[in-house]
Every structure is written in structure tokens, then in C-alpha cells.
Amino acid sequence: MAKRLLPLTAEVSKACIRLLNLPLIEISILTLAKQGVRNFIFGVKGYVNYRSLHDHFESGVGFSAKYGINPRIHIKYQPNLDDCGSADSVRVNVEYYDVTDPVFAVQGDNIFDINLEDMLKFHEQKKAFLTIGLMRVSDVTGYGIAKVDSDTHISEFVEKPTLKEAPSNLANTGLYLFSPEVREVFKEDKVQEMIRKNKRLDFG
């Protein structure tokens, strides 16, 4: 439960909190649907979260009609399987739904403005396994700040650093683009050991 947003999240998923009378996640879905994304998987668990999202979106038919999205979007939901965090939720869903396309992962309460086609082109040009969206910020102390080399490779994130500690002013936006090979990476022994040891597999 998103305790920092109580009482707003007492009976509704954080992703369904309203901004300009729209659930936050509806704004995100519309941003992506306008760019041609048609298949969505909600990595949701817990009764309140599932009920909030399913009652509002169901399979996406009503959303598509509301915004004139044609062909319509298709929304699926995480199966009733335990996960160990946001990254592990991606693992669960790509396996369960046999996803073989690139995967764009974003938190449900994240509002963003991104050209997904440009991000995908960059991702493919770099032959990357994972591309993370970064944003320049004036105040680095409230974000995970990336250390990036001249070829745009990220070597580490420094979480909420002081100005002196910050390796750059590039903040993690919480937007992640995975190649289809993500399924094989999740099966690697070191990833499985990380899950067993830490009981968590989060994006951060």
C-alpha cells in the first residue's frame, strides 16, 4: 500500500488516484496508445489494486471507444502468482503471457512524455538489452542519479546523492525498455540466486 498517499490509497490503487479527473495510469496508457501500443499487461497484485484497475479498464474496450483508439487496446492482468518486486513482476508476466516482443515497463503512477519510437530506435542502434529513460534535473537530491560514460552506458545509480556525490544530473525516470531476451536473463542462475537471497527483484 502507498502509505505516503494515505488516505487517498486506502480504498484505491495508487495508479488510480485522479489527476484532472483521470486516473494517473489512464494518462500513461493514452500516451502510449497514441503512439501505437496496443497490448498492455498490468503487473498488479492485491485485491484493492486489482479491483481498482479491473473495474475501470476491464479488457480495454471502453477505453478504446472513449478515445477513438482503433484497432483497440488489449489489457491483461498479472496472474495470481507471487512476485518479489517490480522487476520480478515483469519476469512473471512475460513468462505467463509468452511475450516475445520488446517490453516497455513503467510504474502505474508515472506520468511521462516520451517519444517511444525514438527510444526504440536508440535501443536497437545500441543493440542494448535494457534502455533506461533519463532526464536532466536541477536538484539531484531527490532522485536516483546515473553515472554515464561517453557511449551512454550506465554503470551505476547513486540514490538521492548530495550535490557533491552526484555523478551527473541525469535522473532515472522509471521508464525501462527491454529486449525480448529479458526472458532468458531472468532464468540465469545469478538472477535466481538474487531472488532467493534478497527476496526482492525491484527496479529501484
Protein language model annotation of sequence segments:
Residues 51-103, 166-167:
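Short phosphate-binding loop-to-helix
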Residues 126-136:
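A short, conserved acidic/glycine-rich loop-to-beta-strand motif
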